């Protein structure tokens, strides 16, 4: 259930440097965890029992997302979770642009056996506590910074043209999924409305 978010982590990047990291534990509704998910992230029902619900936490986290350029590793999944949980609580989507560090990495470096966050972090000597949201966010940021430095990308707006990607967008009432640029210059993407827009 993609609306069942139990932790949110961010890393703020300014002038090519990570300047701030934060995370929030969240008590999902209902507060139940599949054993397989617990094995992945290590968070249990008891760990979040006293944590705020997403809508309460979002008042603190939203300013980091509004009018921001956002990056996630396997962004299609993370952004889907964000859309689902915002819709669950009838919260408006923030206005943001996003891209995927996984897709950037695949285009920035050839020949890696795996482009997962753990493998890339190990290869580049990035300290990572995998599946801890704050650490994942910081590692994702550092991977994108490295890719941009090596390919002389100086601005977020240049990522799409450099790596053959279309930026995704969230906005009030809908979203445009990130996509790959085709050889004919067109994009493979989806545009949708939420169907649940707060009044």
Feature names for model-found ranges:
Residues 1-96, 110-131:
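Conserved non-catalytic scaffold segment of RNase H-like nuclease domains
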Residues 133-147:
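Acidic, divalent-metal-coordinating active-site segment for phosphoryl/phosphodiester hydrolysis
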Residues 145-199:
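Acidic two-metal-ion nuclease catalytic site recognized across multiple nuclease folds
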Residues 95-105:
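A short, structured active-site edge motif that brings together acidic residues
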């Amino acid at each position: 259930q993609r609306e069942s978010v139990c932790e949110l982590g961010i890393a703020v990047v300014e002038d090519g440097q990570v300047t701030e990291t934060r995370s929030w534990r969240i008590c999902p509704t209902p507060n139940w965890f599949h054993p397989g998910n617990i094995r992945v992230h290590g968070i249990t029902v008891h760990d979040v029992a006293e944590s705020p619900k997403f809508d309460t936490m979002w008042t603190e986290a939203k300013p980091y997302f509004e009018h921001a350029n956002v990056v996630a590793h396997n962004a299609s999944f993370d952004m889907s979770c964000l859309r689902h949980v915002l819709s669950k609580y009838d919260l408006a989507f923030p206005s943001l642009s996003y891209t995927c560090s996984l897709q950037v990495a695949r285009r920035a470096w050839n020949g890696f056996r795996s482009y997962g966050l753990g493998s890339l972090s190990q290869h580049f000597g990035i300290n990572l506590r995998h599946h801890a949201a704050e650490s994942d966010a910081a590692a994702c940021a550092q991977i994108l910074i490295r890719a941009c430095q090596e390919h002389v990308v100086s601005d977020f707006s240049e990522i799409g043209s450099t790596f053959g990607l279309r930026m995704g967008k969230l906005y009030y009432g809908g979203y445009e999924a990130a996509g790959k640029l085709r050889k004919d210059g067109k994009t493979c993407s989806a545009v949708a409305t939420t169907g649940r827009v707060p009044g």
